[in-house]
């Protein structure tokens, strides 16, 4: 009943802050309960998915709230809803739900690890190539900046430590563009800086 929603949300919030033995199982239960309670007219799914990294971060499992299960849940959408619908009807549904959810967390974590390894491999490849091509002490700081800001304006380039003169920086950017390591998205014009 909608009149009982505040009571249920209060209980949900208490469980959110409770110390459970297994944080990921607690997360599985919290996520399902939030989706079942459906407290808002719109956005419950998005908010329910956003609560996953927030909860893991709050519990110290993540150093940043940056673990998103959305892609995995979308891939397994039919099974996801089937498990959620079964929670109120089948005695073993909570166990099946937790197994399903934990499988998703594991598979998404493995995919995130694979992508992180690919990004590191790309970084190391580019690092060696850029150092060899530019022979500049500023090549690695520029590469670090590019990885931190994959899309940037030419006027945004900055980092801690020694910074090159504008002509040196322009030469570095030109060398990276010519080698294909930096893609010009929007040419600069007048007062408008280029976007890479």
Language-model features: where?
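Conserved, hydrophobic alpha-helical core segments of structured domains
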Residues: 12, 135-139, 192
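The C-terminal cap of the DNA-recognition helix in HTH/winged-HTH DNA-binding domains
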Residues: 36, 148, 178-179
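Short amphipathic alpha-helical interaction segments
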Residues: 163-178
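Minor-groove-contacting beta-hairpin "wing" of winged helix-turn-helix DNA-binding domains
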Residues: 189-196
């Amino acid at each position: 009943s909608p009149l009982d929603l505040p009571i249920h949300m209060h209980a949900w919030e208490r469980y959110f802050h409770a110390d459970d033995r297994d944080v990921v199982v607690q997360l599985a239960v919290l996520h399902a309960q939030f989706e079942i309670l459906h407290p808002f007219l719109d956005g419950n799914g998005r908010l329910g998915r956003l609560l996953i990294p927030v909860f893991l971060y709050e519990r110290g499992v993540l150093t940043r709230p940056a673990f998103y299960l959305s892609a995995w849940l979308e891939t397994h959408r039919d099974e996801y809803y089937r498990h959620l619908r079964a929670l109120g009807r089948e005695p073993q549904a909570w166990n099946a739900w937790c197994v399903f959810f934990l499988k998703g967390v594991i598979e998404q974590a493995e995919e995130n690890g694979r992508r992180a390894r690919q990004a590191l491999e790309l970084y190391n490849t580019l690092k060696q190539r850029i150092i060899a091509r530019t022979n500049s002490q500023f090549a690695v700081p520029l590469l670090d900046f590019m990885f931190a800001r994959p899309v940037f304006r030419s006027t945004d380039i900055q980092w801690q430590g020694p910074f090159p003169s504008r002509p040196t920086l322009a030469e570095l950017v030109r060398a990276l563009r010519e080698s294909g390591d930096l893609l010009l998205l929007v040419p600069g014009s007048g007062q408008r800086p280029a976007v890479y």
